[in-house]
């Protein structure tokens, strides 16, 4: 059951220089159906009515940018991303504000990290302003999907993948940049409460010179077996160790690690330093900035698992 179609219009926005943003008519679910889904959205289960799509072709650049209906993608079976994992993604959130507006949290940092990840995988980076335009356009179009309940947000997932139909091992010549959104409750089923962690000694997440500091799809596929081990051991998350000595904690399966030593005004924030093998998290960076602004000592260093266990 849907409401009437959104008005068809020619957007005055441009995705990037010379590339207009086309806004299509999008069927929208009824207010009643949307409200029912927002009562208990979970994480990553439901998706908004729209999505953003732009295409890239070598020699032509980014083109065909549009807001369209959320729908399955049509891809060639030989699309390079399906075979060689030339794919990156980001994750950020939009929050309902008391005055009825919607705010995204530090999207410019996601845009910069997304571009850096693209360059690491030999992909054409999405211009940072274009990334922000795409995110803003989707949130504006689907703002009715931003939940207002406690601990609820609109999770936004931009991603880029190699779409060229070609089986040779080289950087693709064609790409898709897509942004989708999903109303979300707490990431963990128990909500915002302490989680139990499992120290992985059998597997590593990333090695020096690899892709550990970018959000590429292959990093997460390779982490799933260790995550299964953690769940089998009754834990919520994996803690990864460094690849060389397997004694320094780096990060968890879905987030960076921080340790608070001491309490009160004397509390110190300790977090593993960015060695190129762990993700430079935006929440991590925000916590460091806030802690320093509050007068706390912040230390970034190689931190052993023995020290973390004390």
Language model features with spans:
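Short, Gly/Pro- and small/polar-rich lid/capping loops
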Residues: 5-67
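Short acidic-glycine loop/turn motifs at beta-strand connectors
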Residues: 55-62, 95-100, 107, 163, ...
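Glycine- and Gly-Pro-enriched alpha-helical subdomains that act as flexible
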Residues: 247-274
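Conserved small/polar residues in nucleotide/adenosyl-binding loops
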Residues: 303-309
